[in-house]
Amino acid sequence: MHPDVQDAFDIARRDFRSCITEHGILAGRHHLNFYKARNAMFASLGANSMGEFTASWKSIELFLSMQRDDGLIPHRITSKLKPHYHHLVTEPLDGNALVIIALRDYLDKANDLQFIEKNFKSAKKAIEWLRGHDTDRDLLLEEPFFAGWQETILKSGKVLYSNCLYFKALKDFAVLANAVGEEKVSEEYERLARRVSEQINSKFWQGNYYCDWIGAIKHDSFSTDGNVLAALFGIADREQSQMIQNKIRQHQLNKVPLQANYPMYPFWRIPPGLLAVDAYNYHNGSSWFWIGCLNSIALSNMGLRKEAKQELKTIARLIKENGSVHEVFLHGKPIKSVFLKSEPFYSWNSALFLKAVNEV
């Protein structure tokens, strides 16, 4: 292992473990001192890669224990264990997809079938809740504003990121169903996953990348989150995945792996109240290590191991330079303003860096 990567690995492991509590995985240890579904579920993938299975299953169990009767899991749970199901006025979609993905990964790594059997009914409710958000019955999910991870950007309709997670959740639920002896259910969800993948390619593919989202019109900005997930999950074939990597290099989005989008979203895509607190760049032209780490795994899966390792070295040097695994970067530095500061001990990034180093 490269010395910079080893040093960064040690820092990331320290930061990640500092976010583990008796209840699960916190989003961070400073101003993000709470449990957030997308953060915890993505972080559980890193926990599993490290053999930290207790942190993984406790995080999954925490959110499923507070699942609403209709199947929605909490968006956020406070440090005092009070659940919140909305972001502003919206019920985010990705937590429900990610809890299924986390369950499948936990089964694969920990081989704990008993835990899956215990939570299968809750998983089924979670995936059925997601299916209910295909409002126009075209197999793709529709969402209102603020329902995905880019909570400061006004997007609505069919969003690439959410639909890639939906595809993966359908595939993984099919595996869970088969594991508990529900073969017919497994076959149903495997078929549905294939059809969703076909629809993503039909609706989103632009010839050399997937568009960002489809509302009243098609928004053809390049979002690295969904494009990387499409390559990682096998929605994109080998040729498409290479085109996505070409697009990333063309716009130098891997200088700080990985810049979230290109080009910049216009100012009117950010709610005015957030502009007032310096949030213009929070999800707009900024860089997030979790996307870079998943991209390094995607590159490795494509056989581009040299490029994958280089991406990890770039991330590692920034981790060493800052002495911790920060949340979000702009122009090579952690975001820091009067109102907005990057979380310095960010579990989502640190856990996926650990996963990427273990797999690349």
Predicted ranges, named:
Residues 1, 41-53, 98-115, 165-183, ...:
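Well-ordered alpha-helical scaffold segments within catalytic/enzyme domains
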Residues 1-34, 58-91, 132-158, 195-288, ...:
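Extended glycan-interaction surfaces of carbohydrate-active proteins
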Residues 31, 47-51, 83-94, 110, ...:
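Short coil/turn segments at secondary-structure boundaries
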Residues 33-41:
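Beta-strand-rich domains and repeat architectures in extracellular enzymes and scaffolds
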Residues 55, 115-118, 122, 185-188, ...:
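Alpha-helical positions within canonical tetratricopeptide repeat
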Residues 119-134:
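An active-site-proximal structural segment forming one wall of the substrate-binding cleft
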Residues 161-203:
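Active-site neighborhood of glycoside hydrolase catalytic domains
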